[in-house]
Amino acid sequence: MPRKKGRKPRDKKRKKPSTDVLSGAERHLVTRFSYGLTKDLVRDVRRRGADAWFAEQLSPGKVGDAPGQEVDGWWPSLGRSPLDLWQRTQSEVEPGWMVMEDYMRRALVRRVRSRRQVLEVMTELWENHFHVPVAADGVFTHRVAYGDAIRSRALGRFSDLLFTVVTHPAMGIYLDNATSTASRPNENLGRELLELHTVGRGLFSEADVKDSARILTGWRVDVWKTFAASYSPEDHATGPVTVMGFSDPNRSADGRELTRRYTDHLAHHPATAKRVARRLAVKFVRDEPPQALVDQLARVYLQHDTAIVPVLKALVASPVFKASRGTKVRDPAEDVVATYRALGVKLRRPATQDSAAEAILWQTDGLGGRPFSWSRPDGAPITNAAWASAGRMAASFGMHWAMAGGWWPSKDVSYRSARSWLPGKSVRFDDLVDHLAERILFRPASKQLLKACCQATGLRPGTKITKSHELVEWGMPRLLATLLDSPAHMTR
């Protein structure tokens, strides 16, 4: 009986899996702790193993990163001093919001290009936890240095990170500690330090907030003049203070060491340990992590003097982490960055406002998730519900379509040609889908994905595809976009 056209022969031998395919466990670890797989990253993991890759990533100084470091010089104003930035704004040479847009671009492009993927992921996590919106009044003068300070401590001790962010001029400007005085302590930072950054709601009193604010007085910024940061002993409120089990006579007008001891106490508080553990578990495991896992991670955190690396090691070793594949939705910025990486798109130094390294910010904006722009001090959500709406998905599909076709952005950027995706002169459509899945999603194509690709293109599994086929001539964007629209790409 003649075989129906387009049907795959039953005895057809399937090709061997590509060397670019990772095991499920490897892919799970690497996608959770990166901004998406690339050919080079996958080959590195296959050569050394995912565990060895992760171990090296936890010591970013050991990871050569010329592509990521090159980005540092692409936007010169990010290296200017606070006074210079302020004067340029006042003279209408360069407004602060433009500098902040460049800061967002640098972060996004770093995530695309950097080989230090775990460092970039952890930097974003802490920059969101200790959120200072880039649009807040005056923070542009110190916001770049604030992000850099977090990045340099993202894999260190939480106690060191906490002291750094609480005393940083950017945080002081945002939450008004920069103008807090002994006679009129401002409670904003004192409250958020307890509620958002450490122990959490419901565990502290208004008296705790008042003393927290008094402890933090003295850390000043000359706002709207030079924006110079300093410590002012005459503005420090002295006298006994008690907060969450921390007590001090607070006799000295120089409260800097007091601040250090106070933040160190909060960093080591059991409630803080559980909040840090839960945040890591929500980010890297699932939206509602088991309490047993949170408690385990909190113990590791305290046993290692608030060091983050041992907590991450314990997290990835847990059975709960291993069983959590495919449970986290990529947020808008993660989706944009992962799409650049999956398609092998090469960004170059921006020459104009239309350059891809500039336009990448508008891409995240179009999906409703530009970096560092959440309006409240609690930081952007890291749970699925916030990013899984129909509107967001439709916006992502549009972005995937534009990039699959290489239509936008199109300046100072390189896309692969449609023909370059073909594995040979002639290939069955189902084998082409497999080939693309292995090079874009780095996994074999599922039956559901093949069905979706057939529906999107109107082709049958057995259709022969050549370089002159209409799919290659004009239909490849639809096929590539179908892969990018799949759950395999939309989750991490």
Predicted regions and their residues:
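N-terminal accessory alpha/beta regions
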Residues: 3, 39-153
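Hydrophobic/aromatic residues in well-formed alpha-helices
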Residues: 42, 50-53, 209, 432, ...
